């Protein structure tokens, strides 16, 4: 299992799988062919179906075009067997002869993969345990918590990296709360974060608390939709959940930054378990793998901050994911706006509820986090492609008919 640095990726929106991943792939291909006369890039499946809305072509062209002309070919009806987000890069010489064809897949969260023989294009594994049942047992045997397991496995600079992650998350909230106007794209969707923030301050504490959480999640998600700088947690489409929960708890409970970083480490571990054993790609398993996993991560982080035991933390995360099972990924017009932005706000509130629910228990429950991850994976594979980031079904289809 990889470092949580590869889960928390700092970059620009609107999509980790459709923008960040293709941009990274283009950069890698350019390094191999800096003298190419031209490039041809074929996008398949979900990448082609919603690539325009996610600015996939823009990310690739911005990277390659300064070197040579780029042709983009769209194949939304062709799904390569390894993953729905496939793309083939071709480098051509001055005689239009192909120098190399390279097929690569954007598998979610900004990560890339080539095929079953070379599944990941990343750094080596750093975790020796790959499911939460084993890690929970380790916590019980050693008396340590999840973040301490992260500390044992990661390099020493992990805390510096998480500090940068936290700073980026807070900056996105601050920018989003100040920004006004309309988000990019044909929906002409107005930003709401600043309005929610102002209105929330006028309520008494109980309602104010929930309104502020909404405003923070909206702020980050709207920044992402505008192509702003955010952190995948675990994806761009779900990037508002974790910052909203952690920022709210730090402001309301005065948690020091180091405790927030430990909560980020714990949340990252849970997100990593899902990424390794299932998927965090909306094109592969639907929105349950994005917003659902973000809710699980935020639930675990919140429960740790409030002193939860390893069993209670695992229970909070399990509920955060379980109650998003079956959630479809059906972005209207292929944009990370409707229903994505509102879902971030709701998931942040759900994470706080999962934390509270777990806090009232001793952590004992029937359905384990690992089991829910397995069910999420199977549910995602059972979902038709209509509901997995193709904008051909669900809300996206109904919106076209309105």
Q: Predicted segment positions?
A:
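C-terminal regulatory domains involved in ligand/effector binding and gene-expression control
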Residues: 69-203, 211-212
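Functionally critical mobile loop/hinge segments
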Residues: 302-402
């Amino acid at each position: 299992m990889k470092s949580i640095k590869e889960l928390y990726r700092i970059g620009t929106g609107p999509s980790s799988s459709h923008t960040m991943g293709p941009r990274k792939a283009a950069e890698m291909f350019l390094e191999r062919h800096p003298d190419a006369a031209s490039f041809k890039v074929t996008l398949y499946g979900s990448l082609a179906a919603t690539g325009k809305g996610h600015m996939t072509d823009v990310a690739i062209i911005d990277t390659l075009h300064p070197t040579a002309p780029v042709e983009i070919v769209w194949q939304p009806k062709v799904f390569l067997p390894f993953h729905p987000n496939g793309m083939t890069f071709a480098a051509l010489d001055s005689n239009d002869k192909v120098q190399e064809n390279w097929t690569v897949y954007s598998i979610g969260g900004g990560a890339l993969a080539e095929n079953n023989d070379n599944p990941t294009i990343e750094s080596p594994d750093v975790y020796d345990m790959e499911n939460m049942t084993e890690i929970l047992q380790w916590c019980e045997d050693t008396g340590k918590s999840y973040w301490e397991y992260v500390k044992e496995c990661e390099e020493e600079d992990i805390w510096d990296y998480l500090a940068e992650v936290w700073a980026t998350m807070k900056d996105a909230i601050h920018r989003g709360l100040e920004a006004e106007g309309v988000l990019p794209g044909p929906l002409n969707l107005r930003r709401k974060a600043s309005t929610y923030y102002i209105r929330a301050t006028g309520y008494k504490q109980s309602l104010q608390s929930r309104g502020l959480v909404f405003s923070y999640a909206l702020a980050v998600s709207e920044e992402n939709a505008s192509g702003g700088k955010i952190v995948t947690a675990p994806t761009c489409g779900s990037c508002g959940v974790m910052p909203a929960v952690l920022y709210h708890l730090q402001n309301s409970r005065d948690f020091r930054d180091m405790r927030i970083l430990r909560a980020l480490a714990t949340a990252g571990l849970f997100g990593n378990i899902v990424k390794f054993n299932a998927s965090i790609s909306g094109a592969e398993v639907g929105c349950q793998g994005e917003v659902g996993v973000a809710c699980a991560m935020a639930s675990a982080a919140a429960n740790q901050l409030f002193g939860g035991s390893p069993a209670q933390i695992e229970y909070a995360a399990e509920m955060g994911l379980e109650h998003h099972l079956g959630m479809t990924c059906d972005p209207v017009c292929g944009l990370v706006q409707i229903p994505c932005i509102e879902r971030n706000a709701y998931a942040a509130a759900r994470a706080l509820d999962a934390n509270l629910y777990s806090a009232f228990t001793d952590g004992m429950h029937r359905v384990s986090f690992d089991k829910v991850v397995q069910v999420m994976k199977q549910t995602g594979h059972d979902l038709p492609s209509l509901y997995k980031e193709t904008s051909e079904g669900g809300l996206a289809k109904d919106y076209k008919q309105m």
